[in-house]
């Protein structure tokens, strides 16, 4: 088993996919993103947790793309665009601690460019 749960956290939806190590999508879906005005980071992680539990037995780690100024090496999120409740937090560390899996984050624009470079447009 070398599958990973990949999230693309956006302002309207959190899209996710179960992917293998060759970036083949095995399953995909989306859930609504908790709105900043009404919710906070606990609601955000609760939504992610439901998805993680669905795939827990099939995954080795979590990857997340999201807006904002991020340090992908440390997992720290300086700004987070519409996901303002995540600004100033270490999102990768939080994911790893909450779900007991290795986790990485990267800026969504960089992820799109890397995916296109690797797999094509």
Per-range role (PLM):
Residues 4-8, 59-63, 104:
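Short glycine-aspartate micro-motif
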Residues 19, 70-71:
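Hydrophobic alpha-helical segments, especially N-terminal targeting/anchoring helices
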């Amino acid at each position: 088993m070398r599958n990973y749960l990949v999230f693309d956290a956006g302002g309207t939806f959190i899209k996710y996919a179960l992917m293998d190590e060759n970036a083949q999508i095995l399953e995909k879906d989306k859930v609504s993103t908790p709105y900043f005005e009404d919710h906070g980071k606990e609601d955000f992680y609760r939504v992610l947790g439901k998805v993680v539990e669905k795939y827990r037995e099939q995954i080795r780690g979590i990857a997340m793309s999201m807006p904002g100024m991020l340090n992908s090496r440390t997992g720290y999120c300086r700004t987070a665009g519409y996901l303002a409740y995540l600004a100033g937090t270490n999102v990768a560390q939080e994911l790893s601690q909450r779900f007991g899996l290795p986790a990485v984050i990267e800026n969504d624009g960089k992820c799109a460019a890397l995916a296109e470079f690797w797999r094509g447009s």
